[in-house]
Curated annotation (Swiss-Prot):
This is ATP synthase subunit alpha, mitochondrial. GO terms for biological process: ATP biosynthetic process. ATP binds at G171, D172, R173, Q174, T175, G176, K177, T178. Mitochondrial membrane ATP synthase (F(1)F(0) ATP synthase or Complex V) produces ATP from ADP in the presence of a proton gradient across the membrane which is generated by electron transport complexes of the respiratory chain. F-type ATPases consist of two structural domains, F(1) - containing the extramembraneous catalytic core, and F(0) - containing the membrane proton channel, linked together by a central stalk and a peripheral stalk. During catalysis, ATP synthesis in the catalytic domain of F(1) is coupled via a rotary mechanism of the central stalk subunits to proton translocation. F-type ATPases have 2 components, CF(1) - the catalytic core - and CF(0) - the membrane proton channel. CF(1) has five subunits: alpha(3), beta(3), gamma(1), delta(1), epsilon(1). CF(0) has three main subunits: a, b and c. PROSITE patterns: ATPASE_ALPHA_BETA. Keywords: ATP synthesis, ATP-binding, CF(1), Hydrogen ion transport, Ion transport, Membrane, Mitochondrion, Mitochondrion inner membrane, Nucleotide-binding, Transport. The lineage of its organism: Eukaryota, Viridiplantae, Streptophyta, Embryophyta, Tracheophyta. The record marks S373 as: Required for activity. Belongs to the ATPase alpha/beta chains family. GO terms for cellular component: mitochondrial inner membrane; mitochondrion; proton-transporting ATP synthase complex. The keyword Membrane applies. Pfam families: ATP-synt_ab, ATP-synt_ab_C, ATP-synt_ab_N. The keyword ATP-binding applies.
Length: 506
C-alpha cells in the first residue's frame, strides 16, 4: 500500500507535535502520616528522603527526618503536632535544614530556625547556611595564638582564653555561669570600638537553650543598654519551645558564627546551656525508640556535642585567618563534675572554668575554683605583660589553700607560713569583681602586679577593693597604656615607686 501525501503530512505533523511536547509538571514526592504523638510523626511513602531533610505537613508545620526505617520514616515536628492527623499528606522540601547568616543578623533575636522573634520585621540582605556541616580539617587550622579577653581578672590571668579555643564554663545552678558569658560579651564593646579593621572586631552569638523567656528578655535589655547588641546575635529556644528546636538551636547559632569565621572575621559563641540540649535530645531519641544507654541518654550523645564543638576553630592564614571561639555552659547537680554529660564535654573542650556554690556564698565572685579550672591552650594566647605578672599567683594560691586548712587547727605558725597566709588572703581578694563591670586588660595587669609584688600585704582586706579602683585612675595614662607591650625594668621601677606611694594612703 502506497503512502499518500496526506498521510505523510499527518505523520510529520504528529512527529513535530510529539518532539515539542513539554510537560511543566512539578513532581513532589509525598507520604502519608501513619501515626503521630509526642512531637513524633511516623510517615509512610517517602522512599527517597535524605537523613536530616526538612519536610512540610499539610497544616504548614515543618519537621526533620531523623529515623529512616524500612517501613516508615520517623519525623520530629518543629512546633505543635495537634494540627497533624493520621492520613495527612507530607511533602519533601528537598533541602537539609538551613538558617540565615550574615551581618544582617547582628542586633536581632531569632528562634532556632532563624526566624526573627524580636518584632522588628523580616531580615534584610542575608545568605543561608546549612545547620550541620563538617568541622574544618587539620590543614585548614592554625594553633590558637590571639587572646580573647573576657574583662574578668580571674579568667584573663589564671585561665586565659584564646581566639578559636573551646573553654567550658561548668558549675551548679545560680553560681554565675551566665554572668561570665555576658561579661565577656560586654567586654568586647570597648575592644570593638578601638578596632581599626574587621580582623580585630569580635562578633558575639549567644544561644539560649531551655531558658525562661523573661531571662532572654532581661539579657536583651542588658545588652542593648550597654550598646552591645549591635555586634551580637541572640538565638533563643526557650523552655516552652518543643524539644527539636532546643536540640537544633546550638547548631543554628554555630552556623551563624561560622559565617564570620569563614570570611576572615572573628566570632564568639556561647551555648547556654548544653545540659538542656542533651536532655532535649534524650527526649527525642527515646520517643523515636532509639535504644537508651547510660543515664537513659542515647549512644551518640557524645557525638552530639563533639561535632558541635569541633566547629570552633582558628583558621590558617591561607583560609582567611578567621576564628570561632566557643564557651559552652554545663550545669552540674550538687557539684558532680564526674557525671556523664559533664565528663563528655570536659574531654571535648580545651579547658574548663569550674564555679562553686560555696565560693559564691563566701562572696568570692566570680566563684572560680582556681585549683580545678584549667586552660589547655590559652596561655599561648596570653599577652606578654600578663604572662610576666601571672607566673606566681596560681602556685601561691594553691599553697595558700593547702596551708589554710591546717592553719585552722594551730595558732603558733612560723613567719614564712604566716606570710604565705597573708599573701594568699590578698590574692583571693584581688580577682573579685562586680557583675557587668569588665576591666580593660591594662588595668588588670596593674592591679595584679600590685598584689603579686606585695604592695597590698600590709593593707586591711576590706581596703583592697578601694585600692584597686583608685590606682588605675591615679597612674599616668601613657604608663598604663604601655603595659600591654610588656614590662621592662624601667617600667617596673616607675610602677614600684607609684604603687609604694599609693599604698601609704591605706
Amino acid at each position: 500500500m502506497e503512502f499518500s501525501p496526506r498521510a505523510a503530512e499527518l505523520t510529520n505533523l504528529l512527529e513535530s507535535r510529539i518532539t515539542n511536547f513539554y510537560t511543566n509538571f512539578q513532581v513532589d514526592e509525598i507520604g502519608r502520616v501513619v501515626s503521630v504523638g509526642d512531637g513524633i510523626a511516623r510517615v509512610y511513602g517517602l522512599n527517597e528522603i535524605q537523613a536530616g531533610e526538612m519536610v512540610e505537613f499539610a497544616s504548614g508545620v515543618k519537621g526533620i527526618a531523623l529515623n529512616l526505617e524500612n517501613e516508615n520514616v520517623g519525623i520530629v515536628v518543629f512546633g505543635s503536632d495537634t494540627a497533624i492527623k493520621e492520613g495527612d499528606l507530607v511533602k519533601r522540601t528537598g533541602s537539609i535544614v538551613d538558617v540565615p547568616a550574615g551581618k544582617a543578623m547582628l542586633g536581632r533575636v531569632v528562634d532556632a530556625l532563624g526566624v526573627p522573634i524580636d518584632g522588628r520585621g523580616a531580615l534584610s540582605d542575608h545568605e543561608r547556611r546549612r545547620v550541620e556541616v563538617k568541622a574544618p580539617g587539620i590543614i585548614e587550622r592554625k594553633s590558637v595564638h590571639e587572646p580573647m579577653q573576657t574583662g574578668l581578672k580571674a579568667v584573663d590571668s589564671l585561665v586565659p582564653i584564646g581566639r578559636g579555643q573551646r573553654e567550658l564554663i561548668i558549675g551548679d545552678r545560680q553560681t554565675g555561669k551566665t554572668a561570665i558569658a555576658i561579661d565577656t560579651i560586654l567586654n568586647q564593646k570597648q575592644l570593638n570600638s578601638k578596632a581599626t579593621s574587621e580582623s580585630e572586631t569580635l562578633y558575639c552569638v549567644y544561644v539560649a537553650v531551655g531558658q525562661k523567656r523573661s531571662t532572654v528578655a532581661q539579657l536583651v535589655q542588658i545588652l542593648s543598654e550597654a550598646n552591645a547588641l549591635e555586634y551580637s546575635i541572640l538565638v533563643a529556644a526557650t523552655a516552652s519551645d518543643p524539644a527539636p528546636l532546643q536540640f537544633l538551636a546550638p547548631y543554628s547559632g554555630c552556623a551563624m558564627g561560622e559565617y564570620f569565621r569563614d570570611n576572615g572575621m572573628h566570632a564568639l559563641i556561647i551555648y547556654d546551656d548544653l545540659s538542656k540540649q542533651a536532655v532535649a535530645y534524650r527526649q527525642m531519641s527515646l520517643l523515636l525508640r532509639r535504644p537508651p544507654g547510660r543515664e537513659a541518654f542515647p549512644g551518640d550523645v557524645f557525638y552530639l556535642h563533639s561535632r558541635l564543638l569541633e566547629r570552633a576553630a582558628k583558621r590558617s592564614d591561607q583560609t582567611g585567618a578567621g576564628s570561632l571561639t566557643a564557651l559552652p555552659v554545663i550545669e552540674t547537680q550538687a557539684g558532680d563534675v564526674s557525671a556523664y554529660i559533664p565528663t563528655n564535654v570536659i574531654s571535648i573542650t580545651d579547658g574548663q572554668i569550674c564555679l562553686e556554690t560555696e565560693l559564691f556564698y563566701r562572696g568570692i565572685r566570680p566563684a572560680i575554683n582556681v585549683g580545678l579550672s584549667v586552660s589547655r591552650v590559652g596561655s599561648a594566647a596570653q599577652l606578654k605583660a600578663m604572662k610576666q605578672v601571672c607566673g606566681s599567683p596560681k602556685l601561691e594560691l594553691a599553697q595558700y589553700r593547702e596551708v589554710a586548712a591546717f592553719a585552722q587547727f594551730g595558732s603558733d605558725l612560723d613567719a614564712a607560713t604566716q606570710a604565705l597566709l597573708n599573701r594568699g588572703a590578698r590574692l583571693t581578694e584581688v580577682p573579685k569583681q562586680p557583675q557587668y563591670a569588665p576591666l580593660p586588660i591594662e588595668k588588670q595587669i596593674l592591679v595584679i602586679y600590685a598584689a603579686v609584688n606585695g604592695f597590698c600585704d600590709r593593707m586591711p582586706l576590706d581596703k583592697i577593693s578601694q585600692y584597686e579602683r583608685t590606682i588605675p585612675n591615679s597612674v599616668k595614662p601613657e604608663l598604663l597604656q604601655s603595659l600591654k607591650g610588656g614590662l621592662t625594668n624601667e617600667k617596673k621601677m616607675e610602677l614600684d615607686s607609684f604603687l609604694k606611694e599609693c599604698a601609704l594612703n591605706y
